[in-house]
Amino acid sequence: MKKLILALLILTPTAWAVGTCNVSNVTSTQNANNRVPDAGVVIVTLTCTADASAHTFPATTVPLVGSYPSGTLLNAYNLTGYVLYQVGRTPGTTQPTANYTTTITDAQGFALDLGLLTTNGSATSAQLTGISSATAPYPVYPTVRSALTVAITANSVNSAQITLDLVFRAVV
């Protein structure tokens, strides 16, 4: 039995180095604080770490309806009919490659990020990008219709860290 346990410990270290990208916070009207300017805003925060050897981030699904922590009644949200308003990208202590790409797509493959987060991720400073296909006075924002898939690509730094804040607004 000791040999089996020892073999498992020796042969599985690569599994510990797998990249992660998880919902780490949801700010909605149920836990309103200084992050939420009004009742029609939901902020979903993803904390992502690249693989320790392959420097890749896993794609992550943001459910259309959910809560944080998952399965609780806390911080409940329903993004149906909301628009993706802004995306904040903050590099962590282990900085990613400059000009990394973030994509946000729905179940039908529509790019809710409108290509605005392509090859322009900063490795050193936080960025807040408005997601609109036109300018004032008539900006057009992509509407959330299904669960979202978030992917980070074009990174070549092992264990790079990125925090994403997806800001959704209710359509008025």
Regions found by a protein language model. Give the residues of each.
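Sec-dependent N-terminal signal peptides
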Residues: L4-P13
